[in-house]
Amino acid sequence: MKYKAHDYQTYATNFILEHPISAVFLDMGLGKSIITLSAIFDLCLDSFLVRKVLVIAPLRVARDTWPAEIHKWDHLHGLTYSVAVGTEAERKAALRQRVSVYIINRENVQWLIEESGIPFDYDMVVIDELSSFKSYQAKRFRTLLKVRPGIKRIVGLTGTPSSNGLMDLWAEFRILDMGKRLGRFITHYRNTFFRPDKRNGQVVFSYKPLPGAEEQIYDAISDITISMKAVDHLDMPECVHNDAIVTLSEKERKAYDSMKQDLVISLKGEEIDAGNAAALANKLSQMANGAVYGEDKRVFQIHDRKLDMLEDLIEAANGKPVLVAYWFKHDLERISERLHKRHIPFSLLDDSDSIRRWNSGELPVALIHPASAGHGLNLQAGGSTLIWFGLTWSLELYQQTNARLWRQGQTADTVVIHHIIAKGTIDERIMTALRKKEKTQTALIDAVKANLEG
């Protein structure tokens, strides 16, 4: 695919090229990966300033997203890469290949540096999700810090931090500039910019920024940081749509295809059938989301692909509030279970109190059903990121849910709307229908016909 860079993307790529140390604070969906890869291509294959690049990312992002981006864009043709995930033998084999870019998951940073036996001779490191290194006590932080002096170029990618994430910036910039801008010690940073918030006697549980601290911190790091604030003068889109693609395993795909072709599948000994085109579309949508109802409303689990992606997107939001749109009741149950498991506070937006808490910034994650996201419901004060976990055929419901955040009174520079889409499923047809603004019923029936016909 031909890459037509937005002005801010060209600006950010040039920023990386011109700054050996750079932090790129852009919300997910604005193209941090392609911005960085464009710079890597130039440094490796044009100016020859860089020989070996190490990309550190969350597992699914390392395994799927970065390789997909390299393959996707025409102008990156010739940029070689290797993905070091999997077993130890597989990782070592990948790291011994002669390529320009080595991609590894963050959990294996310590292994790479201390246990693999492979020299750490990368002259450029890209940390995709800089917040992975926000804990200065974590082994991966301490290990990477040891080899940091030998790294000539380093790039940190993350979403724009919330005010709650300011404390985390110390460790992140300690890795980037070795303590030059925010200090070499956390105690000094904490005492300079924060005051105790929640405490019990001498025990402090949390800190809050001092008045003006946020501006002072951003000013201190501004020479090596590009953020949404830094690119205000550029022609930024008011609303950015991002498709977050997940891929089903062979077994999961087989179950999906069986339902699509035969209108029936067998799960755990029980047959689940779809009697007509509309019912089939409903079942396929459920399966794309990860679960399906049986005859007696029992829920059968198919996969966790969308839950994993949702978790990644929430992490990438870097502390900024996220609104999640779900469609089926079992979506709500499974999302709630995953958030509980990860100790992520959330609430269903189903009454005036939960809406008040969202708008006052008390909820990191809020869940909403499109049918309840009616016209006139003001949610824009609470956040600027919307994630569609499950899609709707209804153009009206889709547009009015998006309009809860993308509306007058929204103070953020950009609203980002993510669609989690299961590759090769009815999700893709729903998105096509929404984008073409086709009539709901006609698009639904046509999509099912297309599925049944091949």
Each PLM stretch: what is its role?
Residues 1-25:
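Conserved pre-motif I regulatory segment
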Residues 103-109, 114-121, 138-152, 156, ...:
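Inter-lobe coupling linker of SF2 helicases/translocases
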Residues 393-454:
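A conserved SF2-helicase RecA2
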Residues 1, 18, 30-31, 35-45, ...:
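Conserved Helicase C-terminal RecA-like lobe
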Residues 28-29, 151-166, 174:
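Conserved helicase ATPase motor motifs in RecA-like P-loop NTPase domains
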Residues 110-115, 164-166, 332-336, 355-359, ...:
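SF2 helicase motor core recognition
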Residues 35, 50-72, 163-168, 328-329:
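Conserved Walker A/P-loop ATP-binding site and its immediately adjacent core
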Residues 61-86, 176-179:
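Conserved helix-turn-beta segment of the N-terminal RecA-like "Helicase ATP-binding" lobe
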